[in-house]
A protein has these predicted regions:
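A residue-identity detector for tryptophan
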Residues: 52-53, 81, 120
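Hydrophobic beta-strand residues in large extracellular and virion-surface proteins
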Residues: 4-6, 28, 82-84, 91-93
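Secondary-structure transition/turn motif
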Residues: 30-33, 94-102
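Glycine-rich loops and low-complexity Gly/Arg-rich segments
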Residues: 52-55, 96-98, 108-109
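Short, structured protein-protein interaction patches enriched in aromatics and acidic/basic residues
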Residues: 71-91
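Mixed-charge, glycine-accented linear interaction segment located at domain edges/termini
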Residues: 103-168
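N-terminal low-complexity, intrinsically disordered segments
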Residues: 1-76
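Enriched - but not universal
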Residues: 55-56, 84, 123
Length: 168
């Protein structure tokens, strides 16, 4: 099982071209392990970028079509990564610690220095189930933020183009 949950926070003070609803709660669950926070109250201190988490997961789905290894950096935490390893149609997901060397990106396709499986390791889900959940939650997110934003918001268009690339 793989499940993504999110809740967006409205922000009345965003600039016209910025994305209203970019932040909120983001959590995913796999095999009884969860990552992220999802609580009923809206507490800004616990909010993260829902937009970037969905963007990175969509990018990972695309990369895993042709490659077998992806690391997604938790941009809020200094050494935490989510490791995705594809073997045939099985995806193994782990929460790991590793250095984030100068010049490394939020998404990497090679192992980072000093990578350690401190937390949970090799939680399995089929690639198709993972892909479907990521795409469906990204579509739901787009529906929710579209009502708060200009129709031609560049961030919404970026997510839509990634979804089209995955489904195409």
């Amino acid at each position: 099982m793989f499940k993504i949950s999110f809740k967006i926070f409205e922000n009345d003070s965003v600039e016209e071209m910025e994305l209203n609803g970019a932040d909120g709660y983001f959590q995913f669950e796999i095999d009884n392990e969860t990552y992220g926070i999802f609580i009923p109250e809206d507490i800004d201190e616990f909010s993260v970028s829902v937009y970037w988490w969905l963007y990175y997961f969509l990018k990972a789905v695309l990369i895993l079509k042709t490659e077998s290894y992806v690391l997604i950096s938790d941009i809020e935490k200094p050494k935490i990564w989510i490791e995705l390893i594809r073997e045939e149609n099985t995806l193994k997901i782990s929460k790991v610690t590793a250095d984030k060397p100068e010049g490394s990106g939020a998404i990497e396709t090679k192992e980072m220095p000093n990578l350690i499986h401190h937390y949970w390791k090799d939680k399995q889900v089929s690639y198709e189930i993972f892909k479907t959940e990521v795409v469906n939650k990204a579509k739901l997110y787009i529906e929710e933020v579209r009502v708060l934003n200009n129709e031609a918001n560049k961030d919404i268009l970026t997510l839509e183009s990634l979804i089209l690339e995955i489904e195409g």
